[in-house]
A protein has these predicted regions:
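Bacterial N-terminal signal peptides that target proteins for export
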Residues: 1-8
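Bacterial N-terminal signal peptides
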Residues: 8-18
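N-terminal activation segment of mature serine protease catalytic domains
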Residues: 23-72, 81-82, 94, 121, ...
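Conserved active-site neighborhood of the chymotrypsin/trypsin-like protease fold
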Residues: 27-31, 58-59, 77-155, 159-162, ...
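Extracytoplasmic/periplasmic, Sec-exported soluble proteins
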Residues: 31-38, 42-45, 65-75, 89, ...
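Sec/Tat-exported extracytoplasmic proteins
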Residues: 43-50, 54-57, 79, 84-87, ...
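Terminal peptide-recognition signature
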Residues: 48-53, 73, 80, 84, ...
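Active-site loop architecture of trypsin-fold serine endopeptidases
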Residues: 59-68, 92-95, 133, 154-166, ...
Length: 239
């Protein structure tokens, strides 16, 4: 009698386990699909806050985006202040902002209103744009971000508008252009033109401002550095 009961239990588990595994697999697929849709939504929102800066009057990103003399910038508040790198705007005789709005490119003159050479950051404002631009927030925990955290970079490398690259935080204790300014190392692809663009967490919050790459060929080699978000936030307040 006992053997019959044991046999029945074994048959029951054999029949149930595949069903449970299948249910778990289906749940995992649904979670992945939901996360992917959420990530896509975050990117679409973030795109509206990332601008192109042209430092070369002979370069028009609308018609010839592959040329040099381009940087990225990110809108950081309701007023429309834009954060970028110091090395993008310093000592430039020409500086113009390109912004994609309502399915068309618009370009504006800008004023440099703050410089922080030590942190390689600069603050600019747009001249003549009346409607506010969407902005991104700094992550509250930007100073506590850990190695291994998923991040993505958004910018205009080589004029390729709104290029998104995904990676992880490789280290939080690097130093960019100054031994006292901490930077984030990431393997998110960063190239020329990404400078000044945001490095973001999966919620679309700024955790860093992309600043430079370490490479022997001046192209992405999996070692990119971004000024840490908490440092950038303090820099903005001081400017």
């Amino acid at each position: 009698m006992k053997s019959i009961k044991y046999f029945s239990l074994i048959c029951f588990f054999i029949l149930c386990v595949p069903f449970n595994i299948s249910a778990i697999e289906n749940d995992n697929v649904l979670v992945e699909a939901r996360d992917e849709l959420k990530f896509e939504s975050v990117i679409e929102r973030a795109k509206k806050s990332v601008v192109i800066l042209s430092m070369n009057p002979n370069v028009d990103p609308e018609t010839d985006p592959s040329q040099t003399g381009l940087c990225s910038g990110v809108v950081i508040d309701e007023v429309g202040h834009i954060l970028t790198n110091f090395h993008c705007v310093y000592n430039q005789n020409y500086l113009r902002l390109y912004y994609y709005d309502a399915d068309d490119w618009e370009n504006y003159e800008v004023n440099v209103i703050g410089l922080d050479p030590l942190s390689d950051l600069a603050l600019i404002e747009v001249i003549g744009k009346e409607e506010p631009m969407p902005h991104l927030e700094f992550a509250e925990d930007a100073g506590e971000i850990k190695s291994g955290t998923d991040v993505f970079a958004l910018g205009h490398p080589m004029g390729m508008a709104w290029t998104v690259t995904k990676g992880i935080i490789s280290s939080t204790e690097r130093y960019a252009r100054h031994p006292f300014v901490k930077a984030i190392q990431t393997d998110s692809a960063i190239n020329k033109g990404n400078s000044g663009g945001p490095l973001m967490n999966m919620r679309g919050e700024i955790v860093g401002i992309n600043a430079l790459i370490i490479s022997r060929i001046s192209e992405n080699a999996g070692v990119g550095l971004a000024i840490r978000g908490d440092i950038a936030k303090k820099s903005v307040k001081s400017m």
